[in-house]
Curated annotation (Swiss-Prot):
An annotated GO cellular component: cytosolic large ribosomal subunit
GO biological process, alphabetically ordered: translation
Gene3D superfamilies: 2.30.30.790
Pfam families: Ribosomal_L19
HAMAP family from the UniProt entry: Ribosomal_bL19
Protein name: Large ribosomal subunit protein bL19
Entry function: This protein is located at the 30S-50S ribosomal subunit interface and may play a role in the structure and function of the aminoacyl-tRNA binding site.
PANTHER family xrefs: LARGE RIBOSOMAL SUBUNIT PROTEIN BL19M, RIBOSOMAL PROTEIN L19
Gene that this sequence comes from: rplS
Membership in a protein family: Belongs to the bacterial ribosomal protein bL19 family.
Keywords of the record: Ribonucleoprotein, Ribosomal protein
Species the sequence originates in: Corynebacterium urealyticum (strain ATCC 43042 / DSM 7109)
Transmembrane segments: none
SUPFAM superfamilies assigned: Translation proteins SH3-like domain
Length: 113
C-alpha cells in the first residue's frame, strides 16, 4: 500500500482553501467544448464533503431558475481552476440533505460571525 500512497500524494492539490458543509463557494471549473476551453463558475452551498485523500469529493447545491442543481466534484480534480469560499455557514450537521426539501427563506443558511 505504500506505493499507492506515494502515487496518491503526488496528485494531491495544496491550493484548495479550507471549507466545510454550509459554506457558500465559487467553483471555477475548466470546461472543454470541442477544441475550445473556458472557465465556468458554479456558485452554491456545500451540502456534503466525503472521502479522504485523492478520492475526496464535495457536493455543491444551487437553485437555478427555480430548479435545484447539485454537482459533485472531486476536491483534487485538475478541472478545478480556482475555489473561493465566499461565506462561512453556521450549521450543526456534516450532511445538509434537508436543504433539498426546503424552498425560499427556509433554505437560507445563517452566516458565521
Amino acid at each position: 500500500m505504500h506505493i499507492l500512497d506515494k502515487v496518491d500524494a503526488a496528485q494531491l492539490r495544496d491550493d484548495i482553501p479550507e471549507f466545510r458543509a454550509g459554506d457558500t463557494v465559487d467553483v471555477h471549473l475548466k470546461v472543454i467544448e470541442g477544441s475550445k476551453s473556458r472557465v465556468q463558475v458554479f456558485r452554491g452551498v456545500v451540502i456534503k464533503r466525503q472521502g479522504s485523500g485523492i478520492r475526496e469529493t464535495f457536493t455543491v447545491r444551487k437553485v437555478s431558475f427555480g430548479i435545484g442543481v447539485e454537482r459533485t466534484i472531486p476536491v483534487h480534480s485538475p478541472n478545478i481552476d480556482k475555489l473561493e469560499v465566499l461565506s462561512r455557514g453556521k450549521v450543526r450537521r456534516a450532511k445538509l440533505y434537508y436543504l433539498r426539501d426546503r424552498h425560499g427563506k427556509a433554505a437560507k443558511i445563517k452566516e458565521k460571525r
